[in-house]
A protein has these predicted regions:
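Acidic-basic catalytic patches of nuclease active cores, encompassing PD-(D/E)XK
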Residues: 1-44
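Active-site beta-strand-loop-beta-strand hairpin of nuclease catalytic cores
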Residues: 46-65
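A short acidic (Asp/Glu
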Residues: 51, 75, 110-114
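Short beta-strand segments enriched in hydrophobic/aromatic residues
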Residues: 57, 68, 102-105
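Short beta-strand-loop-alpha-helix junction that forms the active-site gateway
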Residues: 66-78
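Short acidic (Asp/Glu) patches
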Residues: 80-86
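Nucleic-acid nuclease catalytic cores
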Residues: 88-122
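Intrinsically disordered, low-complexity terminal regions enriched in charged/polar residues
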Residues: 110-179
Length: 179
């Protein structure tokens, strides 16, 4: 519910998540109020591969699997492994970038970290974001897992996907896409 309110750009939700953050982090997170997402919650566990949330906006869309734990590392096995495999399948099938949002409990500041699920080559804006958003790290055996320390802080993710289109970086990215 917390992440849903933030991505939907609800000021109360953004404020609740950034309450113990420094002013710079808070300002980056507040950008979502200007460029919010329509966030749809999947009923129950959702359709296999659709994630817990679907964040939609005119220019971009992400299926998001939400996890939270007291431990900084979360290993995928059983049902969580099946969910991961389904996210890969749907991401490839629909040319989407599935994400994991991982919250570390009892952490001050930005407690959320964002990871992307590798689905191969993506085009347009998603292709550019692929280079910026970290992929799930791999164990020594080569199996993906969630390591909170290696994820992208939520405020950085918001700053990345909610920049105003007048921002020079986005204009140059759009020009590169069109050429």
């Amino acid at each position: 519910r917390e992440l849903r309110a933030v991505l939907a750009g609800i000021p109360k939700g953004v404020d609740a998540v950034t309450r113990s953050c420094d002013p710079v982090t808070k300002a980056k997170a507040m950008q979502v109020i200007e460029r919010p997402f329509l966030v749809v919650r999947a009923a129950g566990s959702g359709m296999e591969g659709s994630g817990d949330l679907l964040a939609l906006r005119g220019d971009i869309c992400f299926p998001i699997e939400v996890k939270s734990s007291k431990k900084p590392k979360l290993y995928l096995s059983g049902r969580t492994w099946d969910q991961y495999q389904s996210m890969i399948y749907e991401g490839k099938r629909c040319e989407l970038m599935p994400l994991y949002a991982y919250r570390l409990k009892s952490v001050r500041g930005d407690s959320w970290r964002i990871f992307r699920v590798d689905v191969g080559r993506l085009s347009g804006r998603l292709g550019i974001l692929t280079r910026r958003i970290p992929e799930l790290p791999l164990t020594r055996n080569g199996k993906p897992f969630l390591d909170w320390e290696q994820g992208m802080p939520l405020h950085q993710f918001i700053s990345l996907v909610c920049r105003k289109s007048t921002t020079p970086t986005l204009e140059s990215l759009d020009k590169r896409i069109k050429n």
